[in-house]
A protein has these predicted regions:
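Glycine- and acidic
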Residues: 7-12, 31-39, 103-110, 243-247, ...
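Residue-level preference for the first positions of well-ordered beta-strands
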Residues: 136-138, 164-166, 270-272
């Protein structure tokens, strides 16, 4: 399957039934490539299915994906025609380990540490709306980066603007506890179902026409629904900020993610999709010790042990060497 991916949108030619095989081939490619060059492995192995699902429901480069930090964008780079560049990953003159606009029209934002993807995505959203254009903007942020103050400032701003904007929370269980999955997923689907949305609107309009008591009944229904949701959906933190919350969803089940991402596209206003992933998935050493494979040098695939490589002088070495120089008087 991987040999069929050579340029953006080639993924749309892949049958849905073949996506699991494509995911497996991408993982194997990443393990083999990073074992030779070094790079960020655990985070990239964790978002293979998430990236495939996003690319499947979006139309790049017209639609925009903003990656927070950016070191988890390797699969994105593969899907946008840079597979052959991995042999020069993070080398001078080679492909960057992060999104770079100079590399591809599909790289929306030159990312860096951290918590800035929602703000950057919101900038694209505002530009789109002011220019009267029509494309999707998706910001992908991890639960660790979501602890940054800039992220919450941007969430608040997105809720205030009330414009269409999708935020994907890539939760690999580092900072945010799991929510009540079954009920939350059910209510998320129910809230965004077109039939339910239409029925809710019609019932509200009809009740408001009832003299004296109609409006009171509507207010009571809203308060009751809100109270029940507060009890069973921890995602109400985001709902209370003014964002529609969908999830959580298994970040390694592509069909479920595609369904939820398509639901997010139907939502009017900002929406946050909560995706649960596992760092290092598909490679046992990285899965058991994701911290050791966050940013790794070349390593032995069988054992996971890093290989000794010849290194150049450190900044400290260079600084020390200058202290021995005799300056002219």
């Amino acid at each position: 399957m991987l040999e069929k991916i050579n340029k953006p949108n080639d993924i749309h030619k892949i049958a849905l039934a073949d996506f699991p095989q494509l995911a497996d081939e991408i993982r194997q490619f990443l393990i083999e490539s990073v074992s030779q060059t070094g790079g960020h492995l655990a985070s990239n192995l964790g978002v293979v299915e998430l990236t495939l699902a996003l690319h499947n429901v979006l139309d790049l480069p017209q639609d925009k994906i903003v990656w927070d930090v950016g070191h988890q964008a390797y699969t994105h780079k593969i899907l946008t025609g840079r597979k052959e560049e991995f042999k020069n990953l993070r080398k001078e003159g080679g492909m960057s380990g992060f999104p770079k606009r100079c590399e591809s029209d599909c790289d929306t934002f030159d990312a860096g540490h951290s918590s800035n993807s929602i703000s950057a995505g919101l900038g694209y959203v505002r530009a789109r709306d002011l220019l009267g254009q029509n494309y999707r903007v998706v910001s992908v942020i991890g639960d660790g980066a979501l602890t940054g103050g800039m992220a919450y400032e941007a969430l608040n701003n997105a809720a205030e603007l009330k414009t269409n904007f999708i935020i994907v929370l890539n939760d690999n269980n580092m900072s945010i506890s799991k929510n009540v999955g079954g009920m939350s997923s059910y209510l998320s689907a129910l809230r965004t179902a077109e039939a339910y949305t239409g029925m809710k609107l019609n019932v509200t309009k009809t009740l408001k026409k009832v003299p004296k008591v109609g409006t009171a009944v509507v207010d009571t229904m809203r308060r009751t629904k809100s109270s029940i949701k507060q009890l069973i959906i921890p995602g109400m933190l985001f709902e209370n900020m003014g964002l529609t919350y969908l999830g959580p969803v298994d970040g390694h089940n592509m069909r479920q993610m595609m369904k939820l991402f398509n639901e997010a596209k139907r939502v009017e206003g900002p929406v946050i999709v909560h995706v649960l992933t596992h760092k290092g998935r598909g490679y046992e050493p990285a899965s058991l010790h994701p911290d050791q494979f966050h940013g790794t040098g070349p390593f032995d695939i069988k054992t996971g042990r890093q290989l000794s490589v010849k290194k150049g002088p450190t900044y400290t070495d260079v600084s020390v060497s200058y202290t021995h120089l005799t300056l002219p008087t």
